[in-house]
């Protein structure tokens, strides 16, 4: 059995996309991890899966798996690629679709130039909603001081359908993203782990951002991370409310807009890379594992 797939990216955040509306495949953590291997598999940051909806008021079910095989609630760059993919595969002819995710409903709107606007929903900031459960909370206004391997780190928390910690830095180029990101991502205060964003405010409508993603590591771009960072910046008064904020990541820029009490709106590009097929049993056998069928 051969399964068709498409390789896509949103600002360098790369995805393997599989249509399970017209195809059938049993996805296991072992298979996903093998497919994610950039030397022996396809290679990707996340696997995006298109499935039939489980409720009548949406068009599709949108599932996301990290390269370590774990299923996650949300991926903003992936959502844009998802919208373009279902159009290209003629699974939908709508320019505006609703999809269900583990964290709720997303509305995706495409244009004719490869850009997609995503209604990311309202950000949540309460610790229980992240979830964020430090043994002792040291808080100054909206900032928390967290002990990270013996060093106090000031951070902000936000949930954009998935958990985020945001750290304001003077220069993202000198920020120790690998060491600090890894330590915070798996910190006991974040029971479901966390994505860690390092934000440099350039002016009221421009930030630079690096994100250490949960279960992946640092990526070229992170859509939900950009939304969490901009929402945090607006909440703290560093950025302009209700205006388009340019979030500049290594892979390119996203436009984020938010006013408190409303949804965060994210707009950005997508790109198709190539299409191919793979044999699930062949992938498993190559690794010395029992075939799926």
From Swiss-Prot:
Name of the top EC class for this enzyme: isomerase
Residues reported in the UniProt entry to bind substrate: 13, 46, 66, 76-77, 162, 195, 213-214, 223-224
One Gene Ontology molecular-function label: diaminopimelate epimerase activity
Enzyme Commission (EC) number: 5.1.1.7
Gene3D superfamilies: Diaminopimelate Epimerase, Chain A, domain 1
Subcellular localization, as worded in the UniProt entry: Cytoplasm
Annotated active site: 75 (proton donor), 222 (proton acceptor)
GO biological process: lysine biosynthetic process via diaminopimelate
Pfam families linked: DAP_epimerase
Pathway stated in the Swiss-Prot or TrEMBL entry: Amino-acid biosynthesis; L-lysine biosynthesis via DAP pathway; DL-2,6-diaminopimelate from LL-2,6-diaminopimelate: step 1/1
Taxonomy, superkingdom: Bacteria
Catalysed conversion reaction: (2S,6S)-2,6-diaminopimelate = meso-2,6-diaminopimelate
Positions marked as site (Could be important to modulate the pK values of the two catalytic cysteine residues): 164, 213
Primary localization: cytoplasm
Quaternary structure note: Homodimer.
The name this protein goes by in its record: Diaminopimelate epimerase
């Amino acid at each position: 059995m051969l399964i068709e797939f498409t390789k896509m990216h949103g600002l360098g955040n790369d995805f393997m996309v599989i249509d399970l509306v017209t195809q059938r495949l049993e996805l296991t953590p072992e298979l996903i991890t093998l497919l994610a291997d950039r030397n022996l598999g396809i290679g990707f940051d996340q696997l995006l899966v298109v499935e039939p909806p489980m409720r009548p008021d949406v068009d599709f079910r949108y599932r996301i798996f990290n390269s370590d095989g774990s299923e996650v609630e949300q991926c903003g760059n992936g959502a844009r690629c998802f919208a373009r993919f279902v159009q290209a595969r003629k699974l939908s002819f709508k320019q505006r679709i609703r999809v269900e995710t583990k964290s709720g409903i997303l509305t995706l709107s495409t244009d004719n130039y490869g850009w997609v606007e995503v209604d990311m929903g309202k950000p949540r900031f309460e610790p229980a909603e992240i979830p964020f459960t430090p043994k002792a909370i040291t808080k100054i206004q909206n900032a928390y001081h967290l002990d990270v391997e013996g060093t106090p780190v000031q951070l902000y928390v936000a949930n954009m359908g998935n958990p985020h910690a945001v750290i304001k830095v003077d220069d993202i180029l000198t920020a120790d993203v690998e060491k600090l990101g890894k330590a915070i991502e798996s910190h006991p205060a974040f029971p479901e782990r966390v994505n860690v964003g390092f934000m440099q405010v350039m002016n009221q409508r421009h930030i630079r951002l690096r994100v250490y993603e949960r279960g992946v590591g640092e990526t070229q771009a992170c859509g939900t991370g950009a939304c969490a960072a901009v929402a945090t910046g607006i909440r703290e008064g560093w950025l302009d409310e209700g205006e388009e904020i340019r979030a500049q990541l290594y892979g390119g820029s996203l436009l984020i807009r938010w006013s408190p009490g409303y949804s965060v709106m994210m707009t950005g590009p997508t790109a198709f890379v190539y299409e191919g097929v793979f044999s699930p049993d062949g992938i498993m056998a190559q690794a010395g594992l029992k075939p799926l069928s």
